[in-house]
């Protein structure tokens, strides 16, 4: 098993902020324009990044801190969409080849985004794709594997979101973050823990797969059922063992939402704030609408790369079928 992942310190986070200058946007923090909320809710709009998600921070910091010689033969990753698109987008601009391994049921819209960069896409059965993530490598690949979850540079890049939240809303009480592998939630929690201890960071999960909630209940990483839905980007088979000590220490708890509540959150974001969010990103708002807090709550809207057909179905009041 790989060694446990360590949290970034303030030097790591500040270095990441400097590397990302001119690449990642300093995204706005806006008040949710919805009256029926248990607390003041604010939206951190990472869906406005050039690649449509926060992944430009993690992938950007990894690539900008990597040895250029190691990048010459190309880069590859395993992703359900957003990490792969961010890597492919960055690789195109750096003039290096990129390959993205996706699960066979990856959303068509996200595959199209990756393809438009010129990157190679390799679709695998879910179990084989998950093996690439767990092993941090793929058989036969000659390039550098880029890990958007466990790489310390990825977590430090994600931590810059926490810096921005505290700068814009120092009185924040709770931050709700979608939980995929734990890289973004732990990055934000690391920054917040250094600057404003006591601020809660909650993992937002969908009822279809609850790796963090289940691990927290069991006291260790456990395998969970991963039922398919229209949501991609969160809901893994387990918390990666090397991430478990970090997520256990940094995250205050979790909130689990049903599919219909997440579809409702997508609709609320669009109708009330004209924000386009994908299912994973809207999971933060779905969770926040049930959270009791003593002060303002921030939802990190991690991405907006939603399939058009899914968005149309939701705006008509439905819940899309699985991809």
Feature names for model-found ranges:
Residues 1-323:
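PLP-dependent amino-acid enzyme catalytic core
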